[in-house]
Every structure is written in structure tokens, then in C-alpha cells.
Regions:
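Terminal-proximal interaction/regulatory segments of ATP-powered molecular machines
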Residues: 50-56, 65-142, 147, 151
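Conserved small/polar residues in nucleotide/adenosyl-binding loops
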Residues: 163-170
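Inter-lobe coupling/hinge segments of SF2-like helicase ATPases
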Residues: 14-22
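Conserved helicase/translocase motor-coupling segment
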Residues: 14, 29-30
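Conserved C-terminal helix/linker of AAA+ ATPases
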Residues: 1-10, 57-59
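Amphipathic alpha-helical repeat elements characteristic of tetratricopeptide repeat
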Residues: 21-22, 38, 77
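C-terminal helical "lid" of AAA+/P-loop NTPase domains
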Residues: 1, 42-46
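C-terminal accessory/connector segments of nucleic-acid motor ATPases
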Residues: 37, 42, 54-58
Length: 173
């Protein structure tokens, strides 16, 4: 009789490093990425009820703010950090509202992964050309000897030029 009662309980499934842990966090992340605040709040509540560390969730939300929201709402990073700070000061259950606020904010924010993609591409490019020296025109020339070797030759101080477009003036890197 007692065993049947225990077996009928709806105990949240969770493991700190296994499929349930990553499944809940993935569902939260993808709900936010999909701009669905209701689903995001549901998966947040599921994760918290299952015993997920709120600070792990905040780390994930911070990651979402820079990878998925990015430059479409750059303030989201600061707002997630402010919510994290609020949670640290209040603790649970009051601080849980700060978590929920971050989930809603990120869900409703426009999304851009341009920085994430640009960073990945620049890392590949830097690895491919890791032995290339910087072009001499952008090297510092603190001595006359370095100037004679071409360091800094042809460098144009951007603040002294009229700004015309976000594209480079020429093909020099």
C-alpha cells in the first residue's frame, strides 16, 4: 500500500550530469531561441523543481544573451548579469523571479548570432594564418630605425579621416 503511494508520486526526473539535466537545459535554451517565453518559463520551472542549480541556469542564460540574442539586443547581457546579482542577494524563492525575468527578456528579444558566427570564423581564419606577420602599415614605429624598415608607413589615423562606410577603404588588413 505504501509502495503504491510512493510509486504514484510525480517525482521530477533529474540527474546532475546526464540526459535529464541536459535535456531540460536544452529545452529551456531552444524555447528562448525560438522566442517562446511561455515554454521558456515552463522549462525553467521544470529545471528548478528538479533541483537544477540556479547559477548553472544563469550561466546558460548569459551564454544565450551573447550567442543567440547578441547584437540584436546587446543590453540583454547586462540585464542577465543584473538579474544574477539580484538572485545572489535574494536567494530562492524571491530570486527565482529574477531568473524568470531573464528568461522572458531573452525570449522576447530579437535574435542575432552574428557575433557568435563571426567569432568562430575569425578563430578558424587566425588558426589558418597563425604564422603571418601583421602588415607593416599597422605596426607601431616608435623609433626612426623601425620607420626606415617601413613600420607604420602609409598608416592613416581613422579619427582624422571622414567616415564614409563601414567597409574597409582598401584590401589591406
Amino acid at each position: 500500500k505504501d509502495l503504491n503511494k510512493i510509486l504514484s508520486l510525480n517525482i521530477p526526473k533529474h540527474d546532475k550530469a546526464g540526459d535529464n539535466h541536459y535535456g531540460l537545459i536544452s529545452a529551456l535554451h531552444k524555447s528562448i531561441r525560438g522566442s517562446d517565453p511561455d515554454a521558456g518559463l515552463f522549462w525553467l520551472a521544470r529545471a528548478l523543481n528538479a533541483g537544477e542549480d540556479p547559477f548553472y541556469i544563469f550561466r546558460r542564460l548569459l551564454r544565450i544573451s551573447i550567442e543567440d540574442v547578441g547584437l540584436a539586443n546587446p543590453e540583454s547581457q547586462r540585464l542577465v548579469l543584473d538579474s544574477w546579482n539580484t538572485y545572489e542577494k535574494l536567494g530562492s524563492p524571491e530570486g527565482d523571479i529574477a531568473l524568470a525575468m531573464s528568461v522572458i527578456l531573452l525570449s522576447l528579444s530579437p535574435k542575432s548570432n552574428a557575433v557568435y558566427l563571426a567569432d568562430k570564423e575569425s578563430q578558424k581564419f587566425a588558426k589558418k594564418y597563425s604564422s603571418e606577420q601583421p602588415p607593416k602599415h599597422i605596426l607601431n614605429s616608435p623609433t626612426k630605425l623601425m620607420g626606415r624598415f617601413g613600420y607604420g608607413a602609409g598608416y592613416e589615423y581613422d579619427h582624422c579621416l571622414l567616415y564614409t562606410s563601414p567597409s574597409p577603404r582598401d584590401s589591406r588588413v
